[in-house]
């Protein structure tokens, strides 16, 4: 759970064809729930989704919302794949519930 923006595009670019990126970290609004609260370390709205589109990844799942597994937090989650890939190999799932569970 650490955001270092200067390396986000590089991280996505390191994926080989069929490679998968699963990423979760805190988003703007998390200040209401605790740390991190520094905007430099909080994702902007749809930032992970835009990263995937900008770097040519296919989004298998994206979420932005509150979870309270250990304590409430506002997070973004992304599951994406570098094409080409077999679409049947990626199970699509529904959004998380309040506990962060599908």
Q: What are the residue ranges of the model-derived segments?
A:
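Conserved beta-strand signature within the Rossmann-like core of class I S-adenosyl-L-methionine
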Residues: 18-30
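Short, flexible active-site-adjacent loop segments at beta-strand->alpha-helix junctions, enriched
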Residues: 3, 27, 63, 84
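A short, conserved alpha-helix within the catalytic core of class I
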Residues: 2-15
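Short alpha-helix
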Residues: 39-63, 76
């Amino acid at each position: 759970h650490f955001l270092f923006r200067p390396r986000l595009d590089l991280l996505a670019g390191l994926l080989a064809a069929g490679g998968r990126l699963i990423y979760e970290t805190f988003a703007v609004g998390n200040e209401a729930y605790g740390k991190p609260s520094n905007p430099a370390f909080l994702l902007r709205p749809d930032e992970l989704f835009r990263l995937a589109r900008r770097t040519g990844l296919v989004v298998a799942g994206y979420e932005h919302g509150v979870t309270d597994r250990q304590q409430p937090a506002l997070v973004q989650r992304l599951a994406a794949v570098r094409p080409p890939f077999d679409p049947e190999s990626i199970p699509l799932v529904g959004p998380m519930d309040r506990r962060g569970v599908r």
